UniProtKB/Swiss-Prot annotation:
Component of the ubiquinol-cytochrome c reductase complex (complex III or cytochrome b-c1 complex) that is part of the mitochondrial respiratory chain. The b-c1 complex mediates electron transfer from ubiquinol to cytochrome c. Contributes to the generation of a proton gradient across the mitochondrial membrane that is then used for ATP synthesis. This is Cytochrome b. It holds the Pfam family Cytochrom_B_C. Gene3D superfamilies: Cytochrome Bc1 Complex, Chain C (1.20.810.10). It is a multi-pass membrane protein. GO terms for biological process: mitochondrial electron transport, ubiquinol to cytochrome c. The gene is MT-CYB.
Length: 379
């Protein structure tokens, strides 16, 4: 008798995606982050659902409803901080996943890569609108500053900003629509994730060598299910440690002050995971130029497959490319640090240098070094 998991229409999909899926035998722990992102998404949807049961998207009660969740709802504080720190874990996994893709040449699966970039944009949008919901000082001013950037668009800018605000400033209408968007976007992300997996399973996974591994495949279960469970346990341990010991470590103290349109915080800054892009935005004195640089800092990922000049897919055997890659990581960490600093000397010039280096590394140095390595192969 044939196994039900191989015949039943629904079970067959699950079987082909998570059980009998042929997987390269040599993929490392860097391939764990895909499943961890799935876990983060499920966790965020569940904690978000319970928070939405008690939250009120109204300017007069939003802040106190979050306080009510933390004080009066059973384990409300736990759910709230799991959700807030879960977002941080989500972005850590996301950036590690993208870094893995860059290092091992996974971007050569173009459809999978492009849907991944769309997913990144959707997650960033979700995190941004979600940060506005507690209606603290940083929520309000973050929303005001970032939405205001759209006014840099010629002709339609001002109209567009007022259309997003639903008025002439960030107010009740803005909060309501941001809550709506924050609720719907995770489901769009889930649909995109399914598409991402669909395209990945058309080609099969890449592996650390970048060499086709069709002749050396093993079933996903039990080998990689157990490996993913280990990753999941480490993720949960890290998240629980963060949530139970230092829940506010990654947050901003200003967000414990109710939103006040008449009082601007000394340093307006987004959550840590947007700081690198914020530093690039601030490093250009011109408003439109800054907005374009901000957009390009993320959308540059779409052009990565076109910039591939190496004869080898992975960086595993390319020491010079590895050097450029780790310089890029160091540069991104520098930008993240600068994004959290006030706009004054020496941070301004450091931010400008780090921003120039960011684009230089991706657009010029990576392709050039790859060409040099191609020449070295012939020696």
């Amino acid at each position: 008798m044939t196994n039900i998991r191989k015949t039943h229409p629904l079970m067959k999909i699950i079987n082909n995606a998570f059980i009998d899926l042929p997987t390269p035998s040599n993929i490392s722990s860097w391939w764990n982050f895909g499943s961890l992102l799935g876990l983060c998404l499920i966790m965020q949807i569940l904690t978000g659902l319970f928070l939405a049961m008690h939250y009120t998207p109204d300017t007069s009660t939003a802040f106190s409803s979050v306080a009510h969740i933390c004080r009066d709802v059973n384990y409300g504080w736990f759910i709230r901080y799991l959700h807030a720190n879960g977002a941080s874990m989500f972005f850590i996994c996301l950036y590690a996943h993208i870094g893995r893709g860059l290092y091992y040449g996974s971007y050569m699966f173009q459809e999978t890569w492009n849907i991944g970039v769309l997913l990144l944009l959707a997650v960033m949008a979700t995190a941004f609108v979600g940060y506005v919901l507690p209606w603290g000082q940083m929520s309000f001013w973050g929303a005001t500053v970032i939405t205001n950037l759209l006014s840099a668009i010629p002709y339609i800018g001002t109209t567009l900003v007022e259309w997003i605000w639903g008025g002439f400033s960030v107010d009740k209408a803005t909060l309501t629509r941001f809550f709506t968007l924050h609720f719907i976007l995770p489901f769009i992300i889930t649909a995109l994730t399914a598409t991402h997996l669909l395209f990945l399973h058309e080609t099969g996974s890449n592996n650390p060598t970048g060499i086709p591994s069709n002749m050396d495949m093993i079933p996903f279960h039990p080998y990689y299910t157990i490996k993913d469970i280990l990753g999941a346990l480490l993720l949960i341990l890290t998240l629980l440690t963060l949530t139970l010991f230092t829940p506010d470590l990654l947050g901003d103290p200003d967000n414990y002050i109710p939103a006040n349109p008449l009082n601007t915080p000394a340093h307006i800054k987004p959550e840590w995971y947007f700081l690198f892009a914020y530093a690039i935005l601030r490093s250009i004195p011109n408003k439109l130029g800054g907005v374009l640089a901000l957009l390009l800092s993320i959308l540059i990922l779409i052009f990565i497959p076109m910039l591939q000049t190496s004869k080898q897919r992975s960086m595993m055997f390319r020491p010079f490319s590895q050097l450029v890659f780790w310089t890029l990581i160091a540069d991104l960490l520098t930008l993240t640090w600068i994004g959290g600093q006030p706009v004054e000397h020496p941070y301004i010039i450091l931010g400008q240098l780090a921003s120039i280096l960011y684009f230089l590394l991706i657009l010029v140095l990576m392709p050039t070094v790859s060409l040099i390595e191609n020449k070295l192969l012939k020696w």
